[in-house]
């Protein structure tokens, strides 16, 4: 029965940050890059846009996937966009675009939306949702903007910023799940799995360590009789 099969998660994304987020939570995903051209999809609503792109990424990987008979295969597609001043910001077109965005964003706030589409390939079911987090940007200087953009980091991420990289000091605070800003919300992933009647603990990699309980040692005591 599929319910007793070990779980396999395929991440339909080239994002190192999403992969690291999963790995830090004890989940080792397989990675298949979707190849979806994000510029071909348009919408007036940021939440609808990121969810549609997440669906397309998951679907693109599904067409190339070969599910294993001895595993229950899941595919997660994600996409993120920044909603700012009524506009939708994905990745900036170039350095000049990134600089212009930061000149507008500094000292102000926006909402980062991350769409998640989780497909249970084995059972033929799907669960999806959008996570949103408010981001408050620091009042950065022109020099800070120019130096940050010159690193290239803002050019490859939605909204032209990160919170887990060089852009971290330029974000004063957030309201919501930080994983949403990175591009994958673990609490939302748990809820989507629950909709499919699956526990997130079933995705933990074999050998995932646990911290020793108080009063115990992680190192086995020697056997006097050995």
From Swiss-Prot:
Molecular function terms, GO-annotated: nucleoside triphosphate diphosphatase activity
EC number: 3.6.1.9
NCBIfam families: maf
InterPro entries: ITPase-like_fam, Maf-like
Keyword Isomerase attributed: no
GO biological process: nucleotide metabolic process
Main function: Nucleoside triphosphate pyrophosphatase. May have a dual role in cell division arrest and in preventing the incorporation of modified nucleotides into cellular nucleic acids.
Pfam family membership, one: Maf
Catalytic activity: a ribonucleoside 5'-triphosphate + H2O = a ribonucleoside 5'-phosphate + diphosphate + H(+); a 2'-deoxyribonucleoside 5'-triphosphate + H2O = a 2'-deoxyribonucleoside 5'-phosphate + diphosphate + H(+)
Family: Belongs to the Maf family.
Name of protein: Nucleoside triphosphate pyrophosphatase
Compositionally biased intervals (Polar residues): 206-220
Annotated stretches, region: Disordered: 204-226
Active-site residues, record numbering mapped to chain: 79 (proton acceptor)
Localisation: Cytoplasm
Major location (coarse): cytoplasm
Keywords: Cytoplasm, Hydrolase, Nucleotide metabolism
Cofactor(s) needed: a divalent metal cation
GO cellular component terms attached to this protein's record: cytoplasm
Gene3D superfamilies with a match to the protein in the record: 3.90.950.10
CDD domains recorded: Maf (cd00555)
């Amino acid at each position: 029965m599929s319910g007793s099969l070990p779980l396999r998660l395929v991440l339909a994304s080239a994002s190192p940050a999403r992969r690291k987020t999963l790995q830090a939570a004890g989940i080792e995903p397989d990675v298949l890059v979707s190849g979806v051209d994000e510029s071909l999809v348009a919408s007036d609503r940021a939440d609808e846009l990121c969810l549609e792109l997440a669906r397309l990424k998951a679907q693109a990987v599904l067409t190339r996937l070969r599910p294993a008979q001895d595993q229950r295969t899941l595919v997660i597609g994600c996409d993120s966009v920044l909603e700012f001043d009524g506009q939708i910001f994905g990745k900036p077109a170039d350095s000049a675009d990134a600089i212009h965005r930061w000149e507008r964003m500094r000292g102000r706030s926006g909402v980062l939306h991350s769409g998640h589409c989780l497909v249970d390939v084995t059972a033929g079911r799907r669960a999806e949702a959008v996570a949103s987090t408010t981001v408050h940007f620091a009042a950065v200087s022109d020099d800070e903007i120019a130096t940050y953009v010159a690193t290239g980091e803002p050019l490859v991420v939605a909204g032209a910023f990160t919170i887990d990289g060089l852009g971290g000091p330029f974000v004063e605070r957030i309201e919501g799940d930080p994983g949403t800003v990175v591009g994958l919300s673990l609490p939302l992933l748990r809820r989507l799995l629950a909709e499919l009647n699956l526990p997130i603990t079933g995705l933990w990699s074999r050998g995932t360590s646990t911290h020793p309980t108080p009063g115990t040692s992680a190192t086995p005591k020697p056997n006097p009789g050995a």
